[in-house]
Curated annotation (Swiss-Prot):
GO molecular function, one term: oxidoreductase activity, acting on iron-sulfur proteins as donors, NAD or NADP as acceptor
Protein name as annotated: Nitric oxide reductase FlRd-NAD(+) reductase
Record InterPro entries: FAD-bd_OxRdtase (IPR050260), FAD/NAD-bd_sf (IPR036188), FAD/NAD-binding_dom (IPR023753), NO_rdtase_NorW (IPR023961), Rbx-bd (IPR041364)
Catalysed reaction equations from the record: 2 reduced [nitric oxide reductase rubredoxin domain] + NAD(+) + H(+) = 2 oxidized [nitric oxide reductase rubredoxin domain] + NADH
Amino acid sequence: MSNGIVIIGSGFAARQLVKNIRKQDATIPLTLIAADSMDEYNKPDLSHVISQGQRADDLTRQTAGEFAEQFNLHLFPQTWVTDIDAEARVVKSQNNQWQYDKLVLATGASAFVPPVPGRELMLTLNSQQEYRACETQLRDARRVLIVGGGLIGSELAMDFCRAGKAVTLIDNAASILASLMPPEVSSRLQHRLTEMGVHLLLKSQLQGLEKTDSGILATLDRQRSIEVDAVIAATGLRPETALARRAGLTINRGVCVDSYLQTSNADIYALGDCAEINGQVLPFLQPIQLSAMVLAKNLLGNNTPLKLPAMLVKIKTPELPLHLAGETQRQDLRWQINTERQGMVARGVDDADQLRAFVVSEDRMKEAFGLLKTLPM
């Protein structure tokens, strides 16, 4: 018997897809298989759990059972998919197998842990499950080292600092958020973190970790070291592509899909953090929401290409929040920065004075939507 549409994964992308399919078709068989509990939680909340004193279980919004009942689903939680036989259209686990008409990979991305000696001492906060495994250690830690000064690293540094912990943030780059924007734009947040007491070790490298009687000794370059109680890796995500590779699909950084979210196999699609859409990996909520709307139509036979507009990315650092959009990482833009007490507006323009990117902060974030309309599609 066919299971209709089979989805591997249960995160934000999978749930958005289920909701969009059920808006259009209440009865088509939907089967979800995932390695976790399949309980729903809001992943961005993980950046604020420590300052808000939340336990992992506090994050649960809907149990797997409630989800299955609400949307008429067949759920297989705590189930590891071991293989996909694309020719036979069968998904396999150790004890089970599922025939599919259409298969969707929504396997997400895993936290990258730098390959240094003692890397097993590093914690990651990429899921409710990961937080559950280390919440006691993080709650009890007085001194925390965050490895990586990107979006998640900056959010976590502020959160741990707000919780009264001694926070050190280390990054190879000369400024925070270096892969997202130039230093003259990120400097406002960088100064705020420093004012709050975050110890920034920029242009610095972690070389190894070692357990000691009183904590963890982190060895750095230039013969430096620091002792802490917990180390968190915030060095980016890697799309989960192992299953797709075993199915013989085309892989680059993520699972390669076209504008219809279709992989190199006509009956297999990919969505969310694991997908590379026409060469782009977009691990943000808005592109996932739009992709799920389009994919639901395509799975139900209404072929619709994905057209992504200019979209906002939000950096959730409550003491100095930022919104950004456009090609903020472009090296050839000229930045026009207007800073006032209530916030900043930074406009990145090209040689023709065309707005290509912007970053806004604090009370001036309300200007984001007007700027968004002037960005080229």
